[in-house]
């Protein structure tokens, strides 16, 4: 074996002051891992301090006390000693006493054990402790003050000491610490296990307090660490460590049938033999690796010590990772198939509000169109390119083209669950939901709606249709819609009169078109122009599907035409449109938007009233929670009430146009919700 030259053992063989002086003078020339020889007086002082702390058990138990014993009686019994703590448990008839030091504890045991107290024979003994730890793999140069500072960081300690060699007086690389509470000891064990200290990692394990005896604290086992990872020759290892003394146990660490431990345990018959081998063989080279020999915790045989070290190494590896594995990018992308996540991502698209956006895109747009989400995914993709996931996951994250499939999957999810559970007002059929979740070219919005429907006069906030179609195509649309501002056929002078107000009306209804796209009487095939033909109210299949819905409040009167939008009660927004009298005895009109545009073109007061009407229009969620009975009462009140006269008159309208009259009646009323 190749041994280190000038080891600590050789340095310690010298005697007298000259040896200590020579050791101190040679200290700068010492190689790494070597320590200077100590003066014999220093060696004696260290050993004396170690033995004093070893026997410094100052907590005692006084058992078999009378049932009515008090703490005052225990103080009087032990009046010759300095008590630091005293507690009497009357149920157990036991007193827990802490004295000044271990010497007083030993004296009290010898004096009061089997002492007769009020007719009872007392039993006095040392308190057992379950907060004792042994810390191994400490640096040889670690001082007692450094060790105390290390362990005191985790709680109040009862005592701590290092184990020194009886020959050289140097530390053996392990020590003991007893905490006041077991919680402190458990925390220290968890934190110190695997902590790097110098060139090695610390080990912390529980110890039996009965092993704290001068003849038992010196270990007989050595840990051979930093072996080659592929080293598996136990016979060669046994031969290497049998040159000075033959070991009684030598085995490589085998974890679950593999030689992946990288260390071994060797046990000798005496602690002196183990110390001699450690001084000579520490730092030898095996298969090109310089191994490290350190003392194991004393008390246990070599086989048990090996099992404890394997378990400790497994615990160190498990502490470096979380309880759950980290998800890879592929799993993150697959999570988008979850319907709950789709609902969150598409929530602004399904229930957009006419509110001024604070950050990101307009509230009528989906979160998937927000630049923050794609940029975050791309940033995360770049961070994961060097991981073990591979190039496939990076390409998946960088390619956002599959994202349009999210809305299609959401539609399938909604259609699969349609009409499963009838609500208070019945569930809308799938034919009604499809227009609300239409996938197609986006609506070219002109303005951005502010708070309460205020129109901010900005143009072309949304890119052209081709751009948004490439950007997932998530917006609702009108089928075959003409570009905004383009006149329909037959407008003539009416179009010229309304040219000043069309831009305002477009701004006011840009956010409302999302909600009015399924209103009856609204032209579905063209823009909001005057002479468009009113299409049929509703296909027969939709009416049949609507009649099949069950409602706890029964069917509404036939005179009231309800909206086909499942989330919006039209009677609360524009009640005159729902009345059958609005369409009786007159030729077909141009629809809701045309009537409102005509009203706007007549004057600023009507325009102000219209803006108030739109401003008081709540969002979809508010109407989804409103009571249907309350809405029916409102509809019946509109049926009975007649149009009220007022200062606002509609110029250029026919007297028989009762639909416009009902619209003006509603615009004048101030509703309080």
Curated annotation (Swiss-Prot):
Q: Where is the composition biased (Gly residues)?
A: 1-17
Location of this chain's protein in the cell? Nucleus; Cytoplasm
Give the UniProt tissue specificity note: Expressed throughout embryogenesis. Detected at low levels in adult lung, brain and kidney, but not in the other tissues tested.
What keywords are assigned to this protein?
Cytoplasm, Nucleus, Repeat, RNA-binding
For bias type Polar residues, the affected ranges are 529-549
| Presence of keyword Aminoacyl-tRNA synthetase | no
Ranges where the RRM domain occurs: 58-129, 131-209, 220-298
Q: Which domain of life, per UniProt?
A: Eukaryota
**Location of the region described as Disordered in the Swiss-Prot/TrEMBL record:** 1-34, 481-549
Which InterPro entries does the entry link to? Nucleotide-bd_a/b_plait_sf, RAVER2_RRM1, RAVER2_RRM2, RAVER2_RRM3, RBD_domain_sf, RRM_dom
Give the matching PANTHER family. RNA RECOGNITION MOTIF-CONTAINING
The protein here is known as: Ribonucleoprotein PTB-binding 2
